Design a protein with these regions (language model features):
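Extended hydrophobic packing segments that form well-structured cores
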Residues: 165-215
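Short, ordered loop/turn segments at secondary-structure junctions
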Residues: 78, 111-113, 166-167, 205
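C-terminal catalytic subdomain
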Residues: 83-162
């Protein structure tokens, strides 16, 4: 949200569709859902104009303005299945990352009953525990699952991530997370990084809502 129109991959996709649209009649049908998978709104019509209107609506619904980044962000994935494993939990990491200061702490609440969710993710983190190394390997040999390892470690360059989860502690460590049993323990650990005077931001639907810094 916010800068979708400035992203190279997005621009390439739009350019590709424009080329296709020169030779074909196209009609777009976009449906926007809420957290319960119910329809919020439907957009239809010209493939690009309808898409732009849908993007504006999504930003209004799921974009949450914030005045400044917080020292500590506490984000819940929003329950099952959004927190079924680390693979899915990474979406909440992405969104909460937008709301935290450099060097801050993000506390993620996620059950992760199915573990990491990807053997390729585990393997990539075991072999290349830095985003630069993972990126270099992906450029040589892109593997689904390993790309999540890059996404996770890239975010960890900015903030400390503490996981409140039923995930096995050894597996959490292998996946580069600090893991604790409850929020109280997470807050005590967070104080090691940000001290005792800090601002907290709560994200009860971390996988859906996107913090947008007010200009």
């Amino acid at each position: 949200l916010g800068d979708v129109y400035k992203r190279q991959v997005y621009d390439d996709q739009v350019e590709g569709v424009r080329l296709f649209a020169k030779e074909h009649k196209m009609f777009l049908f976009h449906s926007i859902l809420d957290a319960q998978k119910q329809f919020l709104k439907v957009f239809a019509g010209d493939w690009y104009e309808a898409h732009l209107e849908a993007c504006k609506f999504v930003e209004q619904v799921y974009g949450v303005p914030i005045s400044e980044p917080a020292d500590v962000v506490i984000a819940s994935c929003g329950g099952y299945p959004k927190d079924i494993n680390i693979y899915q939990l990474q979406k909440t990491m992405d969104n909460s990352w937008c709301a935290v200061k450099d060097g801050g702490v993000i506390i993620i609440l996620g059950e992760c009953e199915e573990g990491s969710g990807s053997a390729a993710l585990e393997k990539a983190l075991e072999e290349n525990p830095s985003p630069d190394a993972i990126k270099a390997e992906l450029e040589k040999n892109f593997v689904i699952g390993a790309h999540k390892a890059f996404a996770i470690t890239r975010l960890m360059k900015k903030a400390h991530f503490i996981l409140v989860s039923a995930l096995d502690k050894e597996l959490a460590k292998k996946l580069l997370f600090e893991s604790v049993d409850d929020v109280d323990a997470a807050m005590k650990l967070a104080e090691k990084y940000v001290g005792k005077d800090y601002k907290v931001l709560l994200m009860p639907q971390g996988s859906l809502t996107v913090p947008v810094l007010k200009k």
